[in-house]
């Protein structure tokens, strides 16, 4: 039986509003966690929900700094001054719709070739950062087929994370909540991003390299 306070130490790195929301999520999940549920893939755990923290960068772009499995999807935006706010469903859907239009006309950062990531304006906006995160696999699932086989998306999805460590923590966190995924052939090399693991027969995509990340 999992204790509702078991992972509080994991959230110590997250401050303010995000920490309070995380604690409430863990408490709400405790009853559900008492009932073991078999999961066949990483995508099943992602579909349950994701807690995502996006951090504003100096170039006004956004990066994923932390994300964990959750019973519901919450997206928190932290600005340069450290102020945090939870995006409303209306805001999220508006951002995703705007990003979908960019994907359709080829102007989304997610589907453009990686030009090195260090040029001015090369960062990701809120919409692309959301779709590159675990939350994007849930909230933007209806446009997943536009991204699934796009090689540029497979590379750029990792770049939406602030560091290789943030990406790896996310992959490990969602993998732990889908224990049966390890029995399905191991991690897939060459695919990254949560849309890349959405096939029922796919296993978690975990990259061992650090290429493509921007700090």
Swiss-Prot record:
Compartments reported by the entry? Cell membrane
Signal sequence residues: 1-27
User: What topology does the record note for this protein and the membrane?
Assistant: Lipid-anchor
Task: Return the Low complexity bias intervals.
Answer: 170-208
| UniProtKB keywords | Cell membrane, Lipoprotein, Membrane, Palmitate, Signal
- Ranges annotated as biased composition (Polar residues): 158-169
Lipid-substituted positions (S-diacylglycerol cysteine) = 28
Q: What is its main location?
A: membrane
Q: Where is the lipid attached (N-palmitoyl cysteine)?
A: 28
Region labeled Disordered — which residues? 158-215
- Annotated Gene Ontology cellular component terms: plasma membrane
HAMAP family, from UniProt?
Answer: UPF0323 (MF_01421)
What family classification does the UniProt entry report for this protein? Belongs to the UPF0323 family.
Q: What is this protein called?
A: UPF0323 lipoprotein HP_0232
Q: Which organism is it from?
A: Helicobacter pylori (strain ATCC 700392 / 26695)
